[in-house]
Amino acid sequence: IGYADLPGASPTQIATITHLDVVPEGNGWDADPFTLRVRDGWLLGRGVADDKGPSVLCLYALKFLKDEAGPLRYPVRALLGCNEETNMKDVAWYNAHEKPPVFCFTPDAEFPLCNGEKGQFEADLISPVLNGDILDFEGGVARNAVPDRASALIRAELAALPAAEGITLEQ
């Protein structure tokens, strides 16, 4: 975790927090997802909305306060995390080594304002082999991202399987 500071008169600090890490890029990109580009007036690249754009916003806010606000009553810190997408151990490390701010705001969401995280659940589902017909099963590239596709390789008689949209049967 890194940070940028503006001094203030009080020892009581306020902060913003954003993150610079991203989930894996997934499928469907028509250009390198890690190269920022402009298309039709929009910035495109992995993590622009979550959360590099808000990170830049916080740094510009500090620059604005430095240039336009005059002396600040409270010091302001822009925290830039690098571990939000997995377990936020960087924040735990920060809190163990630095005094946490009395107020911390994150612009990591769309309007209207939200005041909480949806929570997370992570599990490994393990089953004994029931009949040996499932040879492989995959879905997604990261535990914390909704997969855009899934696949299963099964052993079965082709004639016994019904045709269905979105399912490819191969012999």
Regions found by a protein language model. Name each.
Residues 85, 91-171:
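Midchain, well-structured core segments that form catalytic/ion-binding scaffolds
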Residues 54, 90-91:
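Residues at alpha-helix caps and immediate loop-helix transition turns in enzyme cores, especially N-
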Residues 1-46, 67-72:
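Acidic/His- and Gly-rich active-site-bordering loop/insert found
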Residues 26-28, 57, 88, 115:
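Active-site-proximal flexible loops/turns
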Residues 16, 37-85, 124-129, 148-157:
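Alpha-helical metal-binding/catalytic segments enriched in His/Glu/Asp
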Residues 32, 72-74, 121, 165:
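Residue-level signal for beta-strand positions within conserved beta-sheet cores that form or flank
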Residues 20-22, 76-87, 107-112:
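Acidic, glycine-rich active-site loops and adjacent beta-strand->loop/helix elements
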